[in-house]
Amino acid sequence: MSLDLVHFPNYKKTFFGSSFQSDTLALLTRIRDEIGCRYVTHTYRGRVGDCTKVNSADLTVLITLPATWVARYSSKNYFAIDPVFQEDAPYYRNDTSAIARDLKEDADICPAVAELLHDAEKHGLGNLFIAVSARNPKGVAGCTVFTFEVEDEDRTQFLARMRPRLLSLAGIIHGTVCGCKDANSVASLLTPREVDCLRWAANGKTDGEIAEILSIARWTVVTYLQNAKIKLNCSNRTSAVATALSLGIIDMPEVQHLV
């Protein structure tokens, strides 16, 4: 097993490869600014730039956390209890997809995880940690953790409101880090109408609303999205939208429709 660690402390440049660094750091900064998260961590089982090995023993971790917290995390050996890195974590399983989970669920059943999250909050990382699954067209799985400071809104309502957006963004980050960007071959499989339906779905529109916008029947929209899902090798609509976004087949939607 090998570990590739890519660290942008507080969204600052590092000594990592300049091409990867510029594109990825710009993406992470844009995501932070758009959704108001504090920090982003992404991990997937594979090497940087390798999007082909399913269930690899290798691990890539991309973080924007402060260097002081990374040092503390290491000294406390939090890796051993972090729910995102456990062997049975649901985010990497082949039979699951489109997961957006408040890590408080893990803290409620494990005192060690509760201690980890409390320590992270005490050190300014936020009070809400949401783990989001991602999967590329080749089946390589990953997980993004977004941290937020939520005061006035119920956690459950916040997660429900942000879930579609976070799933899309996790897919974009995943595709960027593991280098699965061969959009031309995938895009050529999709019809213009399938792309249109994916684009409107990414903007939060229902099947009925998409049908009205495109002046077609609702069942036709369902068929287009089903075909797109199959062509993108995705198990559900949300995953198909996230994959299309990560490959640049459709543009990242504005966040206003979720507010």
From Swiss-Prot:
CDD domains referenced in this protein's UniProt entry, alphabetically: LuxR_C_like
Domain HTH luxR-type: 183-248
InterPro entries according to UniProt: Sig_transdc_resp-reg_C-effctor, TF_LuxR_autoind-bd_dom, TF_LuxR_autoind-bd_dom_sf, Tscrpt_reg_LuxR_C, WH-like_DNA-bd_sf
Record key words, sorted: DNA-binding, Quorum sensing, Transcription, Transcription regulation
Disulfide-bonded cysteines: none
Region (C12-HSL binding): 76-179
Coiled-coil segments on the chain, per record: none
A biological process term (GO) from this entry: quorum sensing
DNA-binding region: 207-226
One GO MF term: DNA binding
PANTHER family, sorted: DNA-BINDING TRANSCRIPTIONAL ACTIVATOR DEVR_DOSR
Function: Transcriptional regulator involved in the global control of Brucella gene expression. Mediates the effects of the quorum sensing autoinducer C12-HSL (N-dodecanoyl-homoserine lactone) on a large and diverse number of genes.
Record protein name field: HTH-type quorum sensing-dependent transcriptional regulator VjbR
Gene field: vjbR
